[in-house]
Structure formats: structure tokens, C-alpha cells
Amino acid sequence: MNVSELTPLPDQKVAFTLASVKLLPSVAGCYVLTNFSDEILYVGLTVNLFQRFKQHRETPEKCQPTTLGRAQWFYFVTADETEINAIERGWQNQFSAIHGALPVLNKIDAPVR
């Protein structure tokens, strides 16, 4: 599934590189890791996009190649903390409705929020 098929659509994008961390705000939001072709590899939520991005960059499993390729892009939308659970669940449900499972990297445990 391509990130462009999600509703609501993430409205910002940075490369999934350490150099990009400085471009992220320290606010709540939902995000999607995609490969170079924008195929979804991971869907998540956080109360701090800046910190969460750094955590994912420090998680070897999130940086290794998957069956769909390596994470290249970090798409995100900022949202109030009261809205992020619904946005993330909606994105996961949209993905699962097409593929019958969560994205490949959502199967890897990571620190909460």
C-alpha cells in the first residue's frame, strides 16, 4: 500500500536519515516509514516526533532491509495528543483491510510512544 492512499494523508516528509532529525518538531503526531517507492513499512504514533525519529534511527531492525526494501522516507502529520490514537488506528486498519496484516516493521517491538 502506498502512503498516498492513507486518510488523512500525512502532509510532511523527510528522509529517514540522521541528518533529517533536526527538521522534525518536538510535538505529537502520527508517522509512516516507507521505502523509496513510498510503500508503507511502518505506521506509528508519538507524543514527540523528534524523539521518536531518533529512537527509530537507533533501532537496527528499523534501518535494515525488509522484503519491501529499506526505510527511506518518514512521512508525518502533527496532531493533538487526543487525536493520535484514532489516526494511527485508522491508518493501521486501512493497511490491514488491503493486506490482512500490519505493515512489516510493525511486527518489531519498539518502545511505546
For the regions a protein language model found, what residue spans apply to each?
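A broadly used, surface-exposed interaction patch
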Residues: 52-72
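Short, exposed beta-strand/loop patches in secreted or surface proteins that constitute
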Residues: 5-6, 74, 108
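GIY-YIG nuclease catalytic motif and its immediate N-terminal context
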Residues: 1-47, 51, 55, 79-92, ...
